[in-house]
Regions:
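Internal alpha-helical transmembrane segments
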Residues: 69, 73-80, 84-145, 236, ...
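A structural signal for short beta-strand/turn segments enriched in small hydrophobics and glycine
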Residues: 149, 157-160, 256, 264-267
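Functional transmembrane alpha-helices
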Residues: 89-98, 212-266, 273-401, 416-439, ...
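Residue-level signature of transmembrane alpha-helical entry/exit and packing/kink sites
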Residues: 2, 6-10, 98-107, 387-391
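Small-residue-rich helix-interface/hinge motifs
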Residues: 2-86, 402-424
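Alpha-helical transmembrane segments of multi-pass membrane proteins
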Residues: 14-18, 72, 114, 118, ...
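Interdomain regulatory linker/hinge segments that flank or connect interaction modules
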Residues: 82-123, 163-211, 352
């Protein structure tokens, strides 16, 4: 069921974005009197399709291959490679008969719509839900530092005062792209000492293999045990994707449950060492993989010791209650939400550009390229309206950027050839366009295979 929810959210989000993207091309073409022959969600490769109907001169349908969609524009060299049509004399209602500036607008139509959709999504989310953030000035216990944060010199309990000299108001900014992409300088208060620590611009490559908590997070004081993982026949099942990829099923273990720890217990010490903060508890436990530890806890005013065998992952299967840091909520009016939404959309677009740049320069591994499998996992196994639209907005901006790349077969490839035509004042030959289309198609197939391979290997923990 979890896998179906993931797949369903992915299908819904991508289908919406693909239809709107292709609608951008469709409307631009029709506005200039260009004939559109097909409008398809998914590809009807080799002529197979789920269904179709014809209205006017346009065939609308749903293909069987869920890797995007397309509009077939008359007189245009595209993925259909209809060379027979291109061999005929150009007709006034064909793409190739129109001025270069009109063809350029048609090719940019889908990208423009994706950008507009991204802005609208972030605009409406900001207007409807406002913004929540952790008040950095209230983090009196400082930060909890993961392994990657420790590598650059950060320590548990440090307080971040500023980023690149600007006072840090929202803690979330410390784990945003302005720090992770651009190699920022952090102003740190450690005890009574002010320090300056530089974040290397290669740090994202390490974080991509983990989560942001392996960098920094607010430091949480432990209260009591909230949850103790216990055997559950329904929950203890092999995941949907593990079944697909044949990954061996490992039955979960429940060390805390087996030792007798219960929700409501307050953990005081591990192996005699006091643990006030969750990072202290986590560190003591993780250092004792496959070993027995003694946990001292308080239950109804009475101290009790538990002998717990730590699992091979370095966990014991509990989730504590935390004394959460202070957060702030800001509401925005309808009009003032627009520039905020536009800024969020533009930042997402720039982050995609920076990511590609870092891959080209070797500062970010190409292993971060994801297929629909990876995207589905990001959507998650439960439906959350805000998360769904946030991710859909992010993907809309990512699609806009990816389609702008100068790869033949993508919108950006067509744009490059049109710009060349406008500069040299004569069109690029159809033979060159046809060969470029084939090369681009091969590149895209290779990228797709690579992306699926990445996600399959990740599912095996490689």
């Amino acid at each position: 069921m979890n896998g179906l929810i993931m797949a369903g959210q992915l299908l819904l989000g991508l289908s919406l974005l693909v239809i709107l993207h292709e609608l951008g091309h469709f409307l631009a073409a029709r506005a200039f009197g260009i004939k559109v022959e097909k409008f398809y969600l998914f590809f009807d490769a080799w002529g197979f399709k789920l269904f179709s109907f014809k209205k006017g001169d346009v065939e609308y349908g749903v293909g069987w291959l869920p890797l995007g969609g397309y509009v077939k524009i008359a007189g245009m060299i595209d993925e259909s490679m209809d060379t027979e049509q291109m061999a005929q004399p150009a007709q006034p209602w064909e793409f190739r008969s129109k001025p270069a500036w009109q063809r350029l607008i048609v090719m940019l139509g889908g990208i423009i719509v994706n950008v507009i959709v991204g802005i609208i999504i972030f605009w409406m989310l900001t207007f409807k839900y406002g913004q929540n953030y952790t008040v950095n000035g209230k983090l009196t216990d400082g930060i909890s530092v993961g392994n990657i944060g420790k590598e650059i010199g950060l320590k548990n309990g440090d307080r971040i005062l500023a980023i690149n000299g600007s006072k840090l108001i929202k803690f979330e900014d410390a784990i945003s792209s302005k720090v992770l992409f651009d190699g920022a300088q952090l102003t740190i208060l450690r005890g009574n000492q002010t320090l300056y620590i530089s974040v290397p611009d290669t740090i994202l490559n390490k974080l991509s293999k983990n989560d942001k908590e392996n960098f920094i997070a607010p430091r949480y004081r432990m209260a009591s045990v909230a949850t103790v993982l216990a055997p559950d026949e329904k929950a203890d099942q092999q995941s949907f994707f593990d079944k697909i990829f044949g990954r061996p099923y490992v039955k979960p273990v429940y060390p805390a449950y087996a030792a007798g720890i219960k929700p409501g217990d307050s953990i005081l010490a591990v192996n005699g060492k006091s643990v006030t903060f969750f990072d202290q508890f986590k560190e003591e436990v993780s250092q004792n993989k496959n070993k027995q530890i003694t946990i001292n806890a308080l239950r109804k005013g009475k101290e009790i010791n538990f002998d717990v065998l730590v699992g091979k992952e370095g966990t014991i299967g509990i989730a504590p209650n935390f004394k959460m840091p202070e957060t702030a909520h800001v509401e925005f009016g309808f009009a003032e939400s627009l520039p905020i939404g536009a800024t969020m959309a533009w930042s997402t677009f720039l982050d995609n550009a920076k990511g590609i740049g870092k891959m080209i320069t070797g500062k970010l591994s190409a292993r971060n390229i994801s297929s629909p499998i990876g995207i589905a996992k990001v959507y998650g196994s439960t439906f959350d309206w805000v998360k769904f639209w946030t991710l859909t907005g992010l993907i809309s901006m990512a699609l806009a950027f990816m389609n702008l790349l100068p790869i033949p077969g993508l919108d950006g490839g067509h744009v490059v050839f049109l710009l060349i035509e406008m500069v040299q004042r004569k069109p690029v030959s159809e033979k060159v366009l046809e060969k470029a289309q084939i090369v681009g198609f091969v590149i895209l197939i290779c990228l797709m295979v690579f992306a699926f391979g990445n996600d399959i290997l990740k599912s095996f923990g490689k």
